[in-house]
Amino acid sequence: MEASDGQGGEGDKPLEQVTNVSCLETSSSASPARDSLMRHAKGLDQDTFKTCKEYLRPLKKFLRKLHLPRDLPQKKKLKYMKQSLVVLGDHINTFLQHYCQAWEIKHWRKMLWRFISLFSELEAKQLRRLYKYTKSSQPAKFLVTFCASDAPERSLLADREDSLPKLCHAWGLHSNISGMKERLSNMQTPGQGSPLPGQPRSQDHVKKDSLRELSQKPKLKRKRIKEAPETPETEP
């Protein structure tokens, strides 16, 4: 009986903890920011989300600095990003060291970084990579990774160009893909459609120019005939 009572007591503890956490969640459910976090927490179940949130709650200030205004100078962005990642990454390592067994470390490291990524435009793997570069004093790699994530327009253009072969195949078009990419780039950058002096011109331009010249020749002949002065005929 004593053993059964002991088991019952141990079984009641986690239920009591879950009940307390659910009460906290219902009291804070009015916040739209937290609701949106729950909706976008891909790969995080509700219990894992709550665990990550409670452990990282004291570091709200550093979580906010992962998403800075776009008009903030680049130097300040780098400074705040490095400071926040060092504090958050060290906090995660402390959690893994003191609260996780060896087989749990990989899982909880992944979950905690994924939770942190909810406060940033970067993915969890990118944030963890930036943390490693900061801790190992590799500023060049940090800068390359950080700046690459700050240029979404380039990646969007690359995605469009990569999707061209798929579109051509789906529509049954078997034309020159490189030519289509060139025309696409000319359309996206107005004013650069005409070739620069000294650059070879495409066959389409050559054909159009030759047809234009042929159509203009008879007009010039007619114009010359009209403009020629009438000369009186002379008898022999």
From Swiss-Prot:
Pfam families referenced in this protein's UniProt entry, alphabetically: CHD1-like_C
UniProt key word Nucleus: yes
Localization, UniProt: Cytoplasm; Nucleus
Keyword match Amino-acid biosynthesis: no
Top-level lineage group: Eukaryota
Gene Ontology CC, one term: cytoplasm
Principal place of residence: cytoplasm
Ranges where the record places region CHD1 helical C-terminal domain (CHCT): 44-145
Biased composition (Basic and acidic residues): 202-216
Protein name per the record: CHD1 helical C-terminal domain containing protein 1
Species lineage: Eukaryota, Metazoa, Chordata, Craniata, Vertebrata
Gene name per UniProt: CHCT1
